[in-house]
């Protein structure tokens, strides 16, 4: 496989550059990437430390830096080394400025903006934690999204990912031969999404979990027939209620959450017409 070094340089958390890099890397199956993360680069002293690392390990540079002086120093350095230096959002900012006829603000303010979006995200994270794994079912009316599925179908991390996008998500496990949650019998306004998975894949995940916890006496948890029935029952319930179902067998948490958000916002836009 072809090795590829990528330096992610940011005056913040490098997440934007990381998402861009991973999205691009998904198009190259024969590449073995090595990502170097350089967050919170906000002055020349810190940048010079990064530049020395880039010089010792040549690779593509992806950056999100607002300060003009730092950007110039970084791009000049990479130009002299003859390595690509790409602004992840520079083109977007420029096009926004041209289209809206609004001049780009030169001054960079590193104080975080504590706006409504920020507090909505905090509230959503708090909600996801308090309503994990079927807890506090009496507060489901506050949820934007409810996830239901067998154990180990990525319900919890998906709920947290949704929360980071400002959506309150509760998740409820479906266990074969156990009473179904009351909300299944009711007509509710919230978006309910069923998560299912290939039974063989689910058994692998559950066996790994049991090994990690050093538990050897839970045969039903990894019994193929029971696992298969749990997935089939979730599908059946969702079909009866006309709830969408997502098969997470080959999907990342980000993919699953993105699909759920698309369903949620399509539904919301439909009702807001």
UniProtKB/Swiss-Prot annotation:
It catalyses: N(tele)-phospho-L-histidyl/L-threonyl-[pyruvate, phosphate dikinase] + ADP = N(tele)-phospho-L-histidyl/O-phospho-L-threonyl-[pyruvate, phosphate dikinase] + AMP + H(+); N(tele)-phospho-L-histidyl/O-phospho-L-threonyl-[pyruvate, phosphate dikinase] + phosphate + H(+) = N(tele)-phospho-L-histidyl/L-threonyl-[pyruvate, phosphate dikinase] + diphosphate. One of its GO terms (molecular function) is ATP binding. Pfam families: Kinase-PPPase. Keywords: Kinase, Nucleotide-binding, Serine/threonine-protein kinase, Transferase. The keyword Kinase applies. It comes from the Bacteria. Its EC number is 2.7.11.32, 2.7.4.27. ADP binds at residues 149-156. Bifunctional serine/threonine kinase and phosphorylase involved in the regulation of the pyruvate, phosphate dikinase (PPDK) by catalyzing its phosphorylation/dephosphorylation. Belongs to the pyruvate, phosphate/water dikinase regulatory protein family. PDRP subfamily. This is Putative pyruvate, phosphate dikinase regulatory protein. It comes from Rickettsia akari (strain Hartford).
